[in-house]
Amino acid sequence: MKRTWNVCLTALLSVLLVAGSVPFHAEAKKPPKSYDEYKQVDVGKDGMVATAHALASEIGADVLKKGGNAIDAAVAIQFALNVTEPMMSGIGGGGFMMVYDGKTKDTTIIDSRERAPAGATPDMFLDENGKAIPFSERVTKGTAVGVPGTLKGLEEALDKWGTRSMKLLITLTIKLAEKGFPIDSVLADAISDYQEKLSRTAAKDVFLPNGEPLKEGDTLIQKDLAKTFKLIRSKGTDAFYKGKFAKTLSDTVQDFGGSMTEKDLENYDITIDEPIWGDYQGYQIATTPPPSSGGIFLLQMLKILDDFNLSQYDVRSWEKYQLLAETMHLSYADRASYAGDPEFVNVPLKGLLHPDYIKERQQLINLDQVNKKPKAGDPWKYQEGSANYKQVEQPKDKVEGQTTHFTVADRWGNVVSYTTTIEQLFGTGIMVPDYGVILNNELTDFDAIPGGANEVQPNKRPLSSMTPTILFKDDKPVLTVGSPGGATIISSVLQTILYHIEYGMGLKAAVEEPRIYTTSMSSYRYEDGVPKDVLSKLNGMGHRFGTSPVDIGNVQSISIDHENGTFKGVVISGSNDAAIGINLKRK
């Protein structure tokens, strides 16, 4: 079955990508019924794609095979993931795309993070008594929807680095949405788990036909989404941000209690940023600046841990997990106090990473003792300026979002590391009627209780944890890392880097080594594989790891071997993710 799909897909893309025209009559055959044929590790000499869905990886890989570059492939992949992983990301959301330009050697971030509409207010997540509305309620309301940025981000990426048009790259995904594809276990579980949320909106007709959730192996057809993609193909991004669609989207948000208007959509624009940089054991790390907290606290935790010589302890020892947990507590305390949109608040970026502040935080970590009251420090002592906000304690009921991450590298040296999201599974659950676009709940990433760095304000971007990252050695990109998972993203990227560099693990082993995640004394998670006796030891010291393991993150990664001229792509085993290497035929 896979062979038939590949032949058809390749033939169609040959016409599209080589001829450069769009044959609107072209038909894409149905994809395979099984996803277990795809590789979780692959090697290529001419490029690599690693994504969270095999069909998206196929589409990205074929773009590369037919002469498109990594940026072209990334755009095609995002459209494909909107269809195949509709619960994770799409044009109703936003994200952070990091691009290394193989020609100029520059590294750039396209920030397509959603923004609050003009009508948003700091107290919009409080009830009439001034108490925070429970997260489970605010996450499905129109007030949770941020102005989507993904489509504008894709447009900007193609304008800056692309060699193929959006019109061309969106075409194959239109067929995938129209003709459908077999639902995998991940999507089937998500539909089942979130059917109540979906049943409230136009999404019920897509995912709950006849009132019953679609199941694994069923064909998911999304004709309304295909119609929207056709509008974008013919009219560009204006078809989304202006006109009839924009009115329908904003009216839908208002129907669910939000304030978004057509003007909010028309006024939206992306931000182009430089990454923040850090050094770690001979590597240079490029990662995300605010409004994502990911980069700052990834670098801060690496700096704190660097002097502890972590690899002197076994990778599954209680000592290693103790040092990780204590470091996470300190960094996540800082995150809760000082991180926000730098267009609105002062973020002490230099102070948080200052060597003297790092030493100050290191001194709070004791190998044999749990710090039972981890608190934010005062990074403002180490840089000019001051906070224009307070430290405000927030409710503990927030559920971490999901998101998707993927990464692409090509034979011209271009590299993309891209994390993209609608936040929770299926976002708010709100679908734009007749257009098939699922809307994000990104504004619940703001603080519910105002006064802090991350309070709601009009046109402000909510705090993010997305951490698309590229590591360099001798000024050459050698590794990409990223993950979904809300605030767990930072810890997933951290541990992958630690296991690969500090412990010297192969990339596959580093990606799959069991992870922990803890932000405070009341929030603990761990993956299957962390030894039970180690958990008992840690809990005996005062930690509070529970009795049941859970999956943390879903890392996608590419390593680049410049000496041998090869790319290795790695995704999680036992998933429907796929790494596909590109090996072009030589004459």
Swiss-Prot record:
Propeptide: 29-35
PROSITE patterns, per the entry: G_GLU_TRANSPEPTIDASE (PS00462)
PTM comment, free text: Cleaved by autocatalysis into a large and small subunit.
Signal peptide coordinates: 1-28
Catalytic activity annotation: an N-terminal (5-L-glutamyl)-[peptide] + an alpha-amino acid = 5-L-glutamyl amino acid + an N-terminal L-alpha-aminoacyl-[peptide]; glutathione + H2O = L-cysteinylglycine + L-glutamate; an S-substituted glutathione + H2O = an S-substituted L-cysteinylglycine + L-glutamate
Activity control: Inhibited by glucose.
Protein keywords: Acyltransferase, Glutathione biosynthesis, Hydrolase, Protease, Secreted, Signal, Transferase, Zymogen
GO molecular function: glutathione hydrolase activity; leukotriene C4 gamma-glutamyl transferase activity
Record flagged with keyword rRNA processing: no
Pathway note: Sulfur metabolism; glutathione metabolism
Residues given in the record as L-glutamate binding sites: 113, 421, 423, 442, 445, 464-465, 485-486
Gene Ontology CC entries for this record: extracellular region
UniProt-listed GO biological process terms: glutathione biosynthetic process; glutathione catabolic process; proteolysis
Thermal behaviour (record text): Optimum temperature is 60 degrees Celsius.
Activity profile over pH: Optimum pH is 8.0-8.5 for transfer of p-nitroanilide from gamma-glutamyl-p-nitroanilide (gamma-GpNA) to glycylglycine (gly-gly).
InterPro entries in UniProt: GGT_bact (IPR051792), GGT_CS (IPR055262), GGT_lsub_C (IPR043138), GGT_peptidase (IPR000101), GGT_ssub (IPR043137), Ntn_hydrolases_N (IPR029055)
Active site: 403
EC number(s) reported in the record: 3.4.19.13, 2.3.2.2
PANTHER family reported in the protein's UniProt record: GLUTATHIONE HYDROLASE, GLUTATHIONE HYDROLASE PROENZYME
Role summary: Cleaves the gamma-glutamyl bond of extracellular glutathione (gamma-Glu-Cys-Gly), glutathione conjugates, and other gamma-glutamyl compounds. The metabolism of glutathione releases free glutamate and the dipeptide cysteinyl-glycine, which is hydrolyzed to cysteine and glycine by dipeptidases. Uses glutamine as a gamma-glutamyl donor and acceptor for gamma-polyglutamic acid synthesis. Dipeptides are better gamma-glutamyl acceptors than free amino acids.
Quaternary state and interactors: This enzyme consists of two polypeptide chains, which are synthesized in precursor form from a single polypeptide.
Similarity comment: Belongs to the gamma-glutamyltransferase family.
Protein name per the record: Glutathione hydrolase proenzyme
Organism of this sequence: Bacillus subtilis subsp. natto
